[in-house]
Amino acid sequence: MRGARLTGALLALAGLLQVALSLRIAAFNIRTFGETKMSNDTLSNYIVQILNRYDIALIQEVRDSHLTAVGKLLDRLNQDDPNTYHFVVSEPLGRNNYKERYLFVFRPDQVSLLDSYQYNDGCEPCGNDTFSREPAIVKFSSPFTQVKEFAIVPLHAAPSDALAEIDSLYDVYLDVQQKWDMEDIMLMGDFNAGCSYVTSSQWPSIRLRRNPAFWWLIPDTADTTVKSTHCAYDRIVVAGTLLQEAVVPDSAVPFDFQAAYGLNDQTAEAISDHYPVEVTLM
């Protein structure tokens, strides 16, 4: 009996160590994330609950010119410990008066932010820029995973330009490679990479897709939308041997928060029209 208890304790300890020695990373398009959403107790409670699942989370569609909502979000995430989460946020991005930010929240006891930069995609006033919201790239290090340093390239693609923007992520990848002399790069976000925005006949023209160096972890058959549509808009793509080897098999999935929390359609859709997509690194 004593031996059985010891075995059980060791198995439990091994499970805790596996959790501690891994990173869960997500990309979440929180539709129109701003002060209105963070002022709604019900919605903000669920958003915080979702984000607490992750060691690094990319939040897209941040509509918060003065970072008031971002401040409220960090206060909620850090309500028990002021150092639970840190953040890095881009400048407002967009070709017209409509602007969004990329926001990363991360656990500093799990990862360290090493560097960040805004990708230069051309002259916006001249009309020859590539992206509606050019990627704001970050570099992290972690002592707990097989890959010690990696970069994350975020993208919330404009639906009408999704094909061109996804293809141009290849150029961003090359830029990150050269700037930081690194191979282990994760590209993630709401690419609008499905249904009518990118059709099956168009995929072969996308460099990021046809190059075998890139692993697309969220398949075309996935559904990352909350509504009745079935579209794999949100994706995670990884490049680099160490990063690819660190991916826990079958861990890359959409997180269906509606099913997980037993929400009705109205509440789920008020949180967002997208599910987060997530992956675990070991």
UniProtKB/Swiss-Prot annotation:
Q: Which cofactor does it need?
A: Ca(2+); Mg(2+)
Question: Which Gene3D superfamilies does its entry note?
Answer: Endonuclease/exonuclease/phosphatase
User: In its keyword annotation, does this UniProt entry include Nucleus?
Assistant: yes
Q: Name one GO molecular function term.
A: actin binding
What SUPFAM superfamilies does the database record attribute to this sequence? DNase I-like
Q: Which reaction does it catalyse?
A: Endonucleolytic cleavage to 5'-phosphodinucleotide and 5'-phosphooligonucleotide end-products
Mitochondrion recorded as keyword? no
Q: Which UniProt keywords apply?
A: Actin-binding, Apoptosis, Calcium, Cytoplasmic vesicle, Disulfide bond, Endonuclease, Glycoprotein, Hydrolase, Nuclease, Nucleus, Secreted, Signal
PROSITE patterns xref list: DNASE_I_1, DNASE_I_2
Q: Indicate the annotated site residue(s) for Involved in actin-binding.
A: E35, V89
Signal peptide residues are 1-22
Catalytic positions are: E100, H156
E.C. number, please?
3.1.21.1
User: What note does UniProt attach to the cofactor annotation?
Assistant: Divalent metal cations. Prefers Ca(2+) or Mg(2+).
Glycan-modified residues: N40, N128
Q: Which InterPro entries match?
A: Deoxyribonuclease-1_AS, DNase_I, DNASE_I_2, Endo/exonu/phosph_ase_sf, Endo/exonuclease/phosphatase
- Localisation per UniProt entry: Secreted; Zymogen granule; Nucleus envelope
Q: Name one Pfam family in it.
A: Exo_endo_phos
- Supply one GO CC term from the record: extracellular region
Q: Which family is it part of?
A: Belongs to the DNase I family.
Q: What does this protein do?
A: Serum endocuclease secreted into body fluids by a wide variety of exocrine and endocrine organs. Expressed by non-hematopoietic tissues and preferentially cleaves protein-free DNA. Among other functions, seems to be involved in cell death by apoptosis. Binds specifically to G-actin and blocks actin polymerization. Together with DNASE1L3, plays a key role in degrading neutrophil extracellular traps (NETs). NETs are mainly composed of DNA fibers and are released by neutrophils to bind pathogens during inflammation.
Quote the protein name from its UniProt record.
Deoxyribonuclease-1
